[in-house]
């Protein structure tokens, strides 16, 4: 699966901004069929950042969210700034 097909859009809200600042986490809508390995590979390819942990959930509307925790040596704020959301 192509990295651009896996990662759809970043989720921007007060909650996600708090996660970026306090927990070094990013939140994206992802392709529903994407596995955690697909998501991790896409983050590495698109943002050159290593993933420490991924949690996923499917919303009642059928969209899949990925909560991505980056390793300590990477800053989620810098990745968010490169996307223009922070």
UniProtKB/Swiss-Prot annotation:
Keywords annotated in UniProt: Ribonucleoprotein, Ribosomal protein, RNA-binding, rRNA-binding
GO CC list: ribonucleoprotein complex; ribosome
Record-level GO BP terms: translation
A Pfam family hit: Ribosomal_L23
Molecular-function annotations in GO: rRNA binding; structural constituent of ribosome
InterPro entries, sorted: Nucleotide-bd_a/b_plait_sf, Ribosomal_uL23, Ribosomal_uL23-like, Ribosomal_uL23/eL15/eS24_sf, Ribosomal_uL23_CS
Alphabetical list of HAMAP family matching this protein: Ribosomal_uL23_A, Ribosomal_uL23_B
Subunit structure: Part of the 50S ribosomal subunit. Contacts protein L29.
Similarity comment text for this entry: Belongs to the universal ribosomal protein uL23 family.
Protein function: Binds to 23S rRNA. One of the proteins that surrounds the polypeptide exit tunnel on the outside of the ribosome.
NCBIfam families registered for this protein in UniProt: PRK14548.1, uL23_arch
Protein name as catalogued: Large ribosomal subunit protein uL23
